A protein has these predicted regions:
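Cleavable N-terminal export/targeting peptides
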Residues: 1-28
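Solvent-exposed loop/turn segments connecting transmembrane beta-strands
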Residues: 40-50, 76-87, 96-98, 116-122, ...
Length: 158
C-alpha cells in the first residue's frame, strides 16, 4: 500500500510540475485554449489536492504595451475536493528567444470552497508566473507557479 501511495504521489508531483498547453495555429483560429493539471496547495499535507483547469485567450485582443505583449485570459479550475475557481484577467508574454517564453499574469476571480480549503473569501486574486517551451508549431510545454489571495478582504487570508 505504501509503494502504491508513493507511486501515485510521485506521479502527481511530476504532473503538477508540467503544464501542457495546446494551442491552435493563428491561421486556423484566433483562439488559444490551454489545458492544465497540477497540485492545489502542494505545501499543506492536509489540504493539497490535484486540480484540472482550462484557459482561453483571444488572439485578436493581444496588445503590445510598454509592459510586454498583454493578452486577456479567462479560465477555471476544479480540484479533486470540488473546490473551484473561475477567473478573468491579463497576462504578459515575454519572448526569451525563439522557443522560450515567460508569462506572468494577474487574474481576479470567484472561489468556491467545495470540500477543499477555506480561503477566507469568495473573491480571490491569482498571480502566476509561467515558463514555457515551444515544442512545435502550436504546441508548448510549460511549468507554472501561482498564488491565490483575497488581499485581506476576509477575516482569513491563508
Amino acid at each position: 500500500m505504501k509503494i502504491k501511495n508513493l507511486l501515485i504521489t510521485s506521479l502527481l508531483v511530476i504532473i503538477s510540475c508540467v503544464k501542457i498547453v495546446l494551442a491552435e495555429e493563428k491561421a486556423i483560429s484566433e483562439h488559444q485554449y490551454n489545458f492544465y493539471t497540477g497540485n492545489f496547495d502542494f505545501s499543506d499535507d492536509k489540504q493539497k489536492a490535484v486540480l484540472f483547469g482550462f484557459q482561453h485567450q483571444n488572439e485578436n485582443l493581444v496588445r503590445d504595451t510598454f509592459l510586454g505583449i498583454a493578452s486577456p485570459v479567462t479560465g477555471a479550475f476544479i480540484t479533486e475536493n470540488s473546490a473551484a475557481y473561475i477567473y478573468t484577467g491579463v497576462e504578459w508574454n515575454y519572448s526569451l528567444g525563439d522557443k522560450l517564453n515567460l508569462t506572468p499574469s494577474f487574474t481576479p476571480g470567484i472561489y468556491h470552497e467545495g470540500n477543499g480549503k477555506d480561503l477566507g473569501h469568495a473573491i480571490e486574486f491569482k498571480t502566476e508566473l509561467q515558463a514555457n517551451y515551444s515544442i512545435s508549431e502550436g504546441t508548448n510545454l510549460g511549468l507554472s507557479y501561482n498564488h491565490l489571495s483575497n488581499a485581506s478582504l476576509g477575516v482569513k487570508n491563508p
